[in-house]
Amino acid sequence: MNRQLKEIGAIPITTSIIESLYPELKSADKKVVWLEKNGYIIRLKRGLYVVNPEYSGKTLSNELIANHLYAPSYISMSTALRYYGLIPEAVYTHQSMTLKHSRSFQTPIGNYDYKYIARDAFSVGVRSMHKGEYAFLIASPEKAL
């Protein structure tokens, strides 16, 4: 029954996607609660989940999660600099820029911090990076500074 979840892999999914995977169920909320309680999915925030990597066999991407957790957004600041290997320090909070209000999230996967940036500066110097089977948005090294 959970073969569909394994196929999703590391991509964050919403409650409505889970509903579409199990159309035979009348109450998707109960299915979500059951999947979470039994460790098949991990809740990032209300309505957004990832398949547990122990179950899917796929490594989770903090970059991809950051892009989905508070969209529109892209990886920036020290997180981007660390991704490019420009700073030696470990990054414990994944930093991103967003068009929305600044906000922080603490999830079982990690901590995510979003800072507001004006619309006219948002897309300048942002690139799409491919990593394995997925892609995410990240600031160029120059913009991340």
State the predicted function of each range.
Residues M1-P72, P108:
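Short beta-edge/loop segments at beta->alpha junctions of small alpha/beta modules
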Residues N52-A144:
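Nucleic-acid-binding surface
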